[in-house]
């Protein structure tokens, strides 16, 4: 039989092939699409061109938001960039008519409205989304009650949207209070914030405080006192702490000091609000100290801001002029090196702002009626900590001598009297006039620390003289094991 006859005689089992086909069909049946073909929807594709950014802020998504504002008549046109920063760029624009602009039938484009100078001018703040420089925003949002359900730190677009809404709400709160001048907020859309433009004419922005040409020395004092008064009004009336107050975030417009850039501002209930307030006071003092005027101690300004009532103040607490006059005549000037040392201590203090930071004996004093308000109790505790730190820095040597004499006298007494005194001390309350001495290696004197370390080295050196060598110790251990 030839090879061709043998090939013709070969046959494939039909049952085996059907079984294989059924297995393949069962395996891939869920991937077979049986619905009708749809040619209307094109396949969506993500490309880098969708996030192409111009001037760090203008990407296609942001341009659509701006176009929608033009369509709704919020703004008429967008002009050049006024300023750039770590979180946003600010652009100039003219206000729209509030209606949709008319489209020219011949050209198919929007009709350009003539700017006669009578229309309002807007500042458009556009936050950076794709190219972020300022990423450490979590500490300004953490603990903020208003944004407890809208945190998204991992998605930059959602985070910036929350950040823009936060500034809009803070700016609106300050503007509606009427006690602190601020630009009027107009609208917010995602990462685009529209507000009033503070202009000195011909489209030029009013100068920031750092660029303002002071006329005389009295004007520097005036703006310094105004800034201190603003911190109090912001805390007491608007219930906010700026958290980035400086000469860069204030504008002089029509001889008034305007407050801007309140995106990072927090409420007094925020866990770090007092730390932010202390930072604002430091920044303001540093700037005006460079301007060559006398400044107030930081701790004095802090107490002035958080105190509900002021001693010897008979005016309106919401009146900026009355507060400025009170500041100029009542707050003490920082003049000595001791005041500078007190400021350094105050910056490093842990500020008590909640019940968790107080001791049990403090609540006993509150129960006894020695404090009318919990706020005064907390303020008193801060003052006591400050006095303790000050006493430790300046009178450390005197305290060591007195403590040494007390220990010597205690050793002479018998055990029974000592135990009685211990029981009495456990029940006694501390005296307010006696400062609380800070303990621990962190607050130890440098000379004592050096002496203690040297004594420890000498003790270890003496111990090593009588120490059994390691190889000898191993031999002895091995011998004892072999005997057993």
From Swiss-Prot:
It catalyses: L-seryl-[protein] + ATP = O-phospho-L-seryl-[protein] + ADP + H(+); L-threonyl-[protein] + ATP = O-phospho-L-threonyl-[protein] + ADP + H(+); ATP + H2O = ADP + phosphate + H(+). Residues 442-461 have a biased composition (Basic and acidic residues). Autophosphorylated. Phosphorylated by casein kinase II (CK2). Phosphorylation by CK2 stimulates RIO1 kinase activity and targets it for degradation at the G1/S transition of the cell cycle. GO terms for cellular component: cytoplasm; cytosol; fungal-type vacuole; kinetochore; mitochondrion; nucleolar chromatin; nucleus; preribosome, small subunit precursor. The active site is at 244 (proton acceptor), 261 (4-aspartylphosphate intermediate). Transmembrane segments: none annotated. The keyword Magnesium applies. Mg(2+) binds at residues 249, 261. Keywords: ATP-binding, Cell cycle, Cell division, Cytoplasm, Hydrolase, Kinase, Magnesium, Metal-binding, Mitosis, Nucleotide-binding, Phosphoprotein, Ribosome biogenesis, Serine/threonine-protein kinase, Transferase. Residues 440-484 are annotated as: Association with (pre-)40S ribosomal subunit. GO terms for biological process: cell division; maturation of SSU-rRNA; maturation of SSU-rRNA from tricistronic rRNA transcript (SSU-rRNA, 5.8S rRNA, LSU-rRNA); negative regulation of transcription by RNA polymerase I; negative regulation of transcription by RNA polymerase II; positive regulation of rRNA processing; regulation of exit from mitosis; regulation of kinetochore assembly. Residues 407-434 have a biased composition (Acidic residues). The modification Phosphoserine is found at residues 402-403, 409, 416-417, 419. SMART domains: RIO (SM00090). It holds the Pfam family RIO1. Its cofactor is Mg(2+). Its main location: cytoplasm. Required for the final endonucleolytic cleavage at site D converting 20S pre-rRNA into the mature 18S rRNA. Required for the final steps of cytoplasmic maturation of the 40S ribosomal subunit. The association with the very late 40S subunit intermediate seems to follow RIO2 association with precursors of the 40S subunit and may involve a translation-like checkpoint point cycle preceeding the binding to the 60S ribosomal subunit. Despite the protein kinase domain is proposed to act predominantly as an ATPase. The catalytic activity regulates its dynamic association with the 40S subunit. Belongs to the protein kinase superfamily. RIO-type Ser/Thr kinase family. Interacts with CKA2. This is Serine/threonine-protein kinase RIO1. The lineage of its organism: Eukaryota, Fungi, Dikarya, Ascomycota, Saccharomycotina. The gene is RIO1.
